Design a protein with these regions (language model features):
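Glycine-centered flexibility sites
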Residues: 40-43, 114-115, 127
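A short, aliphatic-rich alpha-helical micro-motif
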Residues: 2-3
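Mid-domain beta-loop-alpha active-site segment that forms a flexible
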Residues: 105-125
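E1/E1-like adenylate-forming module used to activate ubiquitin-like modifiers
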Residues: 6-108, 142
Length: 143
């Protein structure tokens, strides 16, 4: 089904290893994989190059993977002196909650993330440069 495609979008929930399996199959078929995330007030996208580092390098366990991605973003942004204090507060609050609630998402970040995906897909299709994991796209309405 994914034969002869240049890119795929992996927006699967990390409730099992299926997203990792999907990435592996795409890598074997030389397909870029876009991983979009809705962080409420921000959109995040990373593109996994078929020959590059897998997203699974953040954690090989699917449970809580979205949180690992958010923590990675926080660490990366802090390293480059662009801390996202609001996201840090959201992550800490989420970690304190009990139960298996999904991460908080807002429609505004869905639109932001869709734009990031559209631009990345355009760049892949036209042979332009695209940030590849471990680099990423991050666009926030909050500072």
């Amino acid at each position: 089904m994914i034969e002869e495609h240049d890119a795929a979008i992996n927006a699967l929930d990390f409730k099992s290893d299926i997203p990792f399996v999907f990435d592996k199959i795409c890598s074997e078929k030389n397909i870029y994989v876009l991983h979009p995330y809705n962080f409420g007030w921000a959109g995040f996208l990373t593109v996994v190059d078929p020959d590059g580092k897998p997203l699974e390098s953040l954690s090989d366990k699917p449970l809580g993977f979205e949180l690992k991605v958010a923590e990675y973003v926080l660490g990366y942004q802090a390293f480059w002196m662009q801390p996202q204090e609001w996201l840090d507060k959201v992550v800490k609050q989420y970690q304190r909650e009990e139960g298996a609630n999904p991460p908080p998402q807002l429609s505004v970040a869905s639109w932001i993330t869709a734009g990031l995906c559209t631009q990345a897909l355009f760049n892949i299709a036209t042979g332009k440069e695209v940030k590849r994991f471990p680099k990423f796209y991050f666009s926030s309405l909050l500072q």
